[in-house]
């Protein structure tokens, strides 16, 4: 069983055990009307749009430094991030919906609920906690699930980042007419990353979609490797959580877009 399969099985058990219904009942509703649109930011931004992530750990990383997360959000906002991603998985990533709810009020930037969504109830909880965007991972969903969850999220006025790991999944994302597509550079079987995976997947990409490269981006040299793939932005977590000088580091990553 892969790590991803294990996580999905865990999410299924949480759904069956009433975890998400309890969250829906106990979390206060946070209004997201003041949140900016990430897609609008991409359209207006001549440089790469940055989704800056808040994370405490992952299945492959357990030594991330502890940060004042309110300050981290403020720094992301101040130094050029266009959106914030917040992990809400507790067991594998050390996040929570309570954390999302506490931090989303600290910024007007779009906030992405980064989780493993397989049921509309999870979308309801994400929105109630104050997310304005959600992640849908093509690899863990059937075509019907992907379409239904995508359409449901859009109906709730949420933006949707549809994540793909190979060209076949990219075609599946096109079928639901996903406007915002994340290309994950992580090998799902071995959980190792290669940023140039983005170049391979986007070699014959379609226009009228926006592409975000995710995972394995540690510095400006990594960004330069994939700049000519035609990406519109980056999702970066570990490198930002480790960085002690975001005022210099974050702007370095916001390179001018190269459109083919």
Curated annotation (Swiss-Prot):
Species annotation: Staphylococcus aureus (strain NCTC 8325 / PS 47)
UniProt keyword annotations, A-Z: Amino-acid biosynthesis, Aromatic amino acid biosynthesis, Decarboxylase, Lyase, Tryptophan biosynthesis
The organism's taxonomic lineage, starting at the top: Bacteria, Bacillati, Bacillota, Bacilli, Bacillales
EC number from the UniProt entry: 4.1.1.48
SUPFAM superfamilies listed in its UniProt record: Ribulose-phoshate binding barrel
Leader sequence segment: none
Catalyzed chemical reaction(s): 1-(2-carboxyphenylamino)-1-deoxy-D-ribulose 5-phosphate + H(+) = (1S,2R)-1-C-(indol-3-yl)glycerol 3-phosphate + CO2 + H2O
Gene Ontology biological-process annotations: L-tryptophan biosynthetic process
PANTHER family: INDOLE-3-GLYCEROL-PHOSPHATE SYNTHASE, TRYPTOPHAN BIOSYNTHESIS PROTEIN
Enzyme class: lyase
Protein name: Indole-3-glycerol phosphate synthase
PROSITE patterns named in the record: IGPS
Pathway listed: Amino-acid biosynthesis; L-tryptophan biosynthesis; L-tryptophan from chorismate: step 4/5
One Pfam family here: IGPS
GO molecular function per UniProt: indole-3-glycerol-phosphate synthase activity; phosphoribosylanthranilate isomerase activity
Family: Belongs to the TrpC family.
């Amino acid at each position: 069983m892969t790590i991803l399969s294990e996580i999905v099985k865990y999410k299924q058990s949480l759904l069956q055990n009433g975890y998400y219904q309890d969250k829906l009942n106990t979390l206060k509703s946070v209004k997201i009307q003041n949140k900016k649109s990430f897609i609008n930011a991409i359209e207006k931004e001549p440089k790469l749009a940055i989704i800056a992530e808040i994370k405490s750990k992952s299945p492959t990383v357990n030594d991330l430094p502890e940060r004042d997360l309110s300050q981290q959000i403020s720094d992301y906002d101040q130094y050029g991030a266009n959106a914030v991603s917040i992990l809400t998985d507790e067991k594998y990533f050390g996040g929570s919906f309570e954390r999302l709810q506490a931090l989303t009020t600290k910024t007007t930037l779009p906030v992405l609920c980064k989780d493993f969504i397989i049921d509309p109830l999870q979308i309801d909880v994400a929105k109630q906690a104050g997310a304005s965007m959600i992640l849908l991972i093509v690899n863990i969903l059937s075509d019907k699930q992907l379409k239904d969850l995508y359409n449901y999220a859009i109906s709730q006025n949420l933006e949707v980042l549809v994540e793909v790991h190979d060209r076949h999944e990219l075609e599946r994302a096109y079928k639901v007419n996903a406007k915002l597509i994340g290309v994950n550079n992580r090998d799902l079987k071995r959980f190792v990353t290669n940023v140039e995976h983005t170049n391979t997947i986007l070699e014959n990409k379609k226009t009228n979609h926006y592409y975000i490269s995710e995972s394995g981006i540690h510095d400006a040299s990594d960004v330069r490797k994939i700049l000519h793939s035609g990406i519109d932005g980056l999702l970066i977590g570990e490198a930002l959580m480790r960085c002690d000088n975001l005022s210099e580091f974050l702007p370095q990553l916001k390179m001018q877009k190269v459109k083919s």
